[in-house]
Structure formats: structure tokens, C-alpha cells
């Protein structure tokens, strides 16, 4: 099993991250098109304004295909805090320490930028 973690945008990652979230949460709690559309829209907006000094995006890939992600949206870090977003690992890589590695990278990124607050939102 070849799992790697890459930083930054990779072609196809917006669609793949949206798909992973949509399939998992559809099965788990019945979320539908509104959820998938929101994930895709907000992730696309984030990627379009991505600033490597302010924001972070890490992708876990299994044999070259995205199977996990985490992001730090630092746009409002000075006022509201850094926004931890799109933290997910697929069933194929869950439980192998990749989720901890992704979270560690995101938290290290925040520490290096002196982001004092980090928040996570949920969808209901």
C-alpha cells in the first residue's frame, strides 16, 4: 500500500474530496445534493483564492488517488481564527495513522504562523 501526503492543490482534488465527503455522509446520515454542492462550491472558492503563506491543503493519496484531506483556511485567522476544513480519510486508509499525520501537519502549520485560534464547523 503506497500512501503519500502532498501539500497544495492537485488537479482533480476538488472533485475527489467532494465525492469522498458526499459518499460517506450520504451513507452515514443521508446527506444529499445540497451537502455535496456546498462542499464542492466552498472547496473550489478556497482553492481559487489559496495563498500558500496563509492557507494549507494536504492530500493523502493511495496509489496516486486522493483518499484523504485536511485544510487550514487562514483568511480570517487574525480576527476569527484559522478554519480547519475538509478533514477526511476514506475507509481504505482510515486507522493507518494517516488521519493523525494530516492533523499534525495542519496544527504545525498553524503554530508556525502563530494562529492562536483554530475552529471547525459542521454541516446540519
What do the predicted segments below correspond to?
Residues 94, 119-124:
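Conserved beta-strand-loop-alpha-helix junction that forms the acyl-donor binding cleft
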Residues 116:
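Short acidic/polar active-site loop segments enriched in Thr and Asp
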Residues 3-92, 100-109, 113:
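Acetyl-CoA-dependent GNAT
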Residues 97:
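Conserved G/P- and acidic residue-centered "switch" motifs that form tight phosphate/ATP-binding loops
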